[in-house]
Amino acid sequence: KPGFYSIQGNHEQMLCAALRDGDALAEYCWVRNGGNWFYELPKAEQQQIRDHWLPKLEQLPLVIDLYTVDNVHVGICHADPVFNDWQELLTALKEYKAKKRDDLIEKLVWSRERISLANKTDLLSEAYRIKGIDWCVMGHTPIRPTPYRKGNCLWLDSGAVFPGGYLSVLEAGKDLHCHQASA
């Protein structure tokens, strides 16, 4: 739907690797991270998911660069923008090749470095500012209280998959508003 955005994260990548490649290690990794539901489905439904959803999931963007109607520049990535400059990330995603690009993508969807440092230090919030953007919105690491903010970084993963967790949705306008509901 217009106004709703989805990006590719580590779970989407695990699903795609398991279903596309049929690699036993990829399947094992996906099952260990919640993918067991797929193998409990009838074979016909599994094939339907492969045929219909796999191409769509593989096309999800790794980052979203958007402007709200109030001209607020919001960058969205799954885990960590890796760089301290949003434009540098966008350029690297376009220009990096092969192994260097794969390493960047792995950090983009798996890294917990930025949130770990934010939790361990009392550095001023400005030390966590991503240049070239008003807000950088991330998830991947369940954290409470949610949303958690440091500089212009905002983490939204409120652990919806865990008991007591809830789903967070961000409404981006002139100000950012987080709405939450029990999962």
What is each of the regions a protein language model found here?
Residues 15-16, 84, 146, 163:
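Conserved protein kinase catalytic core
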Residues 8, 182-183:
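A generic structural motif
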Residues 116-181:
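Conserved beta-sheet core of the metallophosphoesterase superfamily
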Residues 9-10, 38, 57, 78, ...:
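Divalent metal-coordination and catalytic microenvironments
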Residues 6-7, 75, 137, 154:
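Residue-level marker for buried hydrophobic side chains located in beta-strands
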Residues 1-66, 70-72, 102-107:
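Active-site neighborhood of divalent metal-dependent phosphoester bond hydrolases
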Residues 22-25, 92-95, 153-156:
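Glycine-rich, phosphate-binding/catalytic loops in enzymes
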Residues 49-145:
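His/acidic metal-ligating clusters that form di-metal
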